Amino acid sequence: MGAPVGRREFLAGVGGLGAGLGLGALSHWFPLPPSDVKPAWSPGREKLVTSSCLLCPSHCGIRGRLVDGKLVRIQGNPLHPVNRGGLCPKGVAGIQLLYHPGRLTGPVERTGPPGTSRFRRVSWGDALDRITRALAELRSRGDARSAVWLAGETSGIMGEILRRFSGAYGTPHLLLEDYADGSAEVLKLCQGIHAPPAFDFSDSDMVLSFGAALSEAWWCLPQAARAREGQSDRRPRWVQIDVRHSRTAARADEWVPVRPGTYGAVALGIAYVLLREGLYDHERIGERVLGIEDWEDATGQVVPGLRRLVLRYGRTEDVSARAGVSAETLVRVAKTFGRASRPVAVWDQSVSWRSGGLADALAIHALNILVGAVDRAGGVLVQPPVPVPRLDGPADGAPAGGAVPSWI
């Protein structure tokens, strides 16, 4: 039987094992082209390039530091109005996207069966010729509707060009994945505007967060972090409604734990208190909002309004039992939210991306509508559309496949 192992020997052995594993990992070949090594140090030619980060809809301003024409660092742009010099870890790591060995720098053609990673590079001329021939063949057969266009970042005029092209070609299958978290769909259904919301934390006096990772993976971490700075009487009060004690919940002024999948129910319960106690913006609701009260459709059928639905399904006792939050806490948070001067309710993709999440996000945004936080300082803002020039219609009239409206 071996000698007994004490605490000191055990820790030393574990440390040696970790060092060995780390050195072993370094021995593996990493497919990155090595940088040119100079025989002697020299300062190099430095250049700063101003741009925007496109890794999330915030589009923070960035500065890239180039040395001898090679990007070596990405930093926030202190002159940009959105992030004011701050930058989240994802934005800083954008340099890894540039140098990643799997990054596509041109068109490729699949050489293996679907699901494999076997591709070969083709020239731009060859790729454009193939696409043109395939589109022309579909259109000549009257089968233009079978074409599908998938696109990612389409800010500015690019999205309008794709919409006009798909409509002129004759396919309704245009999918623009600009805001795949569903936030733009929430604003489209509530306000008729297909755009992501912008939450004005700096001018708000209460932020009611439904699972939003404001200190971890928010769209614009610098803006959220900046709003948290300063003395408690000069920054908004943060209430985090969350299923776990996340980093954001730990830094909030109050954490309200709830059961998973009940964000929408909690929002409904808060709306119940706002309507019952009259803690909503009567003036804005009366002037700018439709559907709060019952209304009649074109056939004369009475459609229940938001007030009737909330008072029927958002009773405090029912929401308390379902979400696992006490009725006293629910009422207190709702009254604090309704009595604030510039409150705002927020959510993120952890809410809207899951199954049934769109309904939850709609319920949360309904709180902003009730307290008049839409299109107001300290509330929910929407970036106005880019004033791009109006494009002319198709030169050859209606396509063979039949022009149909594009959808997003």
What are these regions, as identified by a protein language model?
Residues 142-146, 280-286, 344, 375-382:
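Flexible, glycine/charged-enriched surface loops at secondary-structure junctions
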Residues 114-120, 279-325:
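N-terminal leader/propeptide and maturation segments of large enzyme subunits in energy/redox metabolism
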Residues 246-251, 309-315, 339-347:
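Short acidic (Asp/Glu) and glycine-rich catalytic loops that position anionic groups and cofactors
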Residues 286-292, 333-337, 382-385:
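Short linear loop/turn motifs
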Residues 328, 337-408:
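A glycine-rich, hydrophobic/aromatic-adjacent loop/helix-cap motif
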Residues 237-246, 333-343:
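Active-site-adjacent bridging/hinge elements
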Residues 1-279, 326:
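N-terminal export/assembly segments and adjacent metallocofactor-ligating motifs
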Residues 159, 163, 264-268, 304, ...:
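Non-catalytic, well-ordered alpha-helical scaffold segments
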